[in-house]
């Protein structure tokens, strides 16, 4: 298990780590199918091919995967794998009642992604004594 990182460190890692390490982390914590779903590919076996450097994901998939890494890493560090999965695949009021994983998969440009990591960061900071801020 990796040591928890600050949000700034997670952001730096997401930008600097080789894409294969990003994908391997997501596969370890979310599973191969969920990683494939987020990236926008239909065949989960592509994830293993990417890690093995047999292929590279397309640029838009790499952007999705790097954003997913940031959100996942923050949530796994704060709560563990199961809560991270539940957050990514559950409806999220801060994101217009859409699942973050769906938003990642559907993203076509940077603007489509910019609200996901801040929402994950806010949720990861929440504790039983300080729940996430709810919007009215």
State each model region's role.
Residues 1-136:
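Non-transmembrane "mature" sequence context
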């Amino acid at each position: 298990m990796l040591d928890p990182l600050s949000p700034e460190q997670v952001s730096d890692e997401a930008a600097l780590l080789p894409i294969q390490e990003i994908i391997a982390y997501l596969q370890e914590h979310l599973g191969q199918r969920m990683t494939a779903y987020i990236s926008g590919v239909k065949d989960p076996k592509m994830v293993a091919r990417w890690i093995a450097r047999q292929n590279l994901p397309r640029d838009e998939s790499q952007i999705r995967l790097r954003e997913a890494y940031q959100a996942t890493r923050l949530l796994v560090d704060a709560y563990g794998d199961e809560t991270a999965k539940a957050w990514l695949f559950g409806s999220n009021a801060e994101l217009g009642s859409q699942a973050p994983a769906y938003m990642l998969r559907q993203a076509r440009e940077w603007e489509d992604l910019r609200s996901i990591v801040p929402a994950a960061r806010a949720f990861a900071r929440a504790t039983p004594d300080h729940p996430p801020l709810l919007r009215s």
